[in-house]
Amino acid sequence: MIALLKPTSEQVGHYDRFLNALVEGGFRGEIARDHGSRTVLATDNSIYQRLPQAAVFPMDSHDVAIVARLAARPEHQQVVLTPRGGGTGTNGQSLTDGVVVDLSRHMNNILEINVEERWVRVQTGVVK
């Protein structure tokens, strides 16, 4: 059976504590807790739906490190993090009822292209 979104979904306290700790820890990216933003990220290119507790949009690798360090703390062991690029997965890979770590909003630059050696260096959010 395919899970359907509930019209309302309460946010769980340990997620609020985690998101507040992100801000206190120097996270410079955006944090989306509102229902509208969460609903947009509840789907991808699949038929599945999962409403996340929140979404974070890291500005850079420093922000990603802050997220990872906080998630490793014992008081945040219940927090589920799921990375997301363009949401183009066809099997619901980027969907979660935890926190979406959306890397496509700010970390989407092509840093270097080496045509002769046929390689590129990109940030994690590059999807096209």
Language-model features, listed with the residues they occupy:
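Beta-sheet entry/capping signal
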Residues: 78-80
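Extended, alpha-helix-rich binding/interface surfaces that flank or overlap catalytic cores
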Residues: 125
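N-terminal flexible segment immediately upstream of the FAD-binding catalytic core
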Residues: 1-72, 76, 86-118
